[in-house]
């Protein structure tokens, strides 16, 4: 992983680049732009704007806003599903584009490794780290094979994030799967009647 910082008008954006490169051009196979600002020597995570595409092949891929993660991925090796640049090919048709679909999946997997390594090494130094934990893929896609791919991707990222200490408590961060929360009905009832809290505590 190579870390780059690029200056914007009011903060620094962090980019992670794969050490694996494209043979012909020497470019990184994948670049991940993290939703992390460097402000006054502090790393602060933030939510990307809902209108920012998450996938790029030099230019943004249309319709990839809210793709499923709070990161931006770029690869010169990505292959679009159509010439219209509106989606990546993650499912082949059993003919000539299966190789493209598998390559796109492997690039996303490489990005996953890069992001996971960065989070593992740096999470304790990132404020508002919960913004790194967004996982919300479109699981109700009309293409069943694509929906299954997104389900497996979602399951993989959720399982990984459950093992990271994203949950902030007054005693420090705890691993996500260790967090316990009130049932919504119980929570609402406790807001209305504070005496109910004695049964909980």
Label each region the model flagged.
Residues 1-201:
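GHKL/Bergerat-fold ATPase module
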């Amino acid at each position: 992983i190579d870390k780059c910082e690029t200056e914007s008008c009011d903060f620094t954006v962090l980019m992670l680049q794969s050490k694996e490169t494209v043979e012909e051009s020497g470019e990184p196979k994948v670049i991940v732009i993290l939703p992390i600002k460097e402000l006054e020597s502090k790393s602060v995570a933030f939510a990307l704007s809902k209108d920012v595409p998450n996938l790029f092949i030099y230019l943004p891929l249309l319709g990839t806003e809210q793709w499923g993660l709070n990161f931006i991925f770029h690869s010169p090796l990505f292959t679009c599903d159509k010439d219209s640049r509106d989606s990546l090919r993650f499912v082949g048709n059993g003919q000539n584009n299966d190789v493209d679909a598998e390559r796109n999946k492997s690039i996303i997997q490489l990005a996953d490794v890069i992001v996971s390594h960065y989070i593992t090494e740096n999470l304790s130094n990132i404020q508002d780290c919960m913004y790194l934990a967004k996982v919300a893929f479109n699981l109700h896609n009309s293409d069943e094979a694509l929906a299954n791919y997104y389900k497996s991707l979602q399951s993989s990222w959720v399982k990984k994030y459950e093992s990271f200490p994203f949950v902030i408590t007054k005693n420090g961060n705890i691993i996500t799967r260790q967090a316990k929360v009130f049932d919504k009905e119980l929570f609402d009832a406790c807001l209305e009647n504070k005496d109910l809290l004695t049964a909980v505590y």
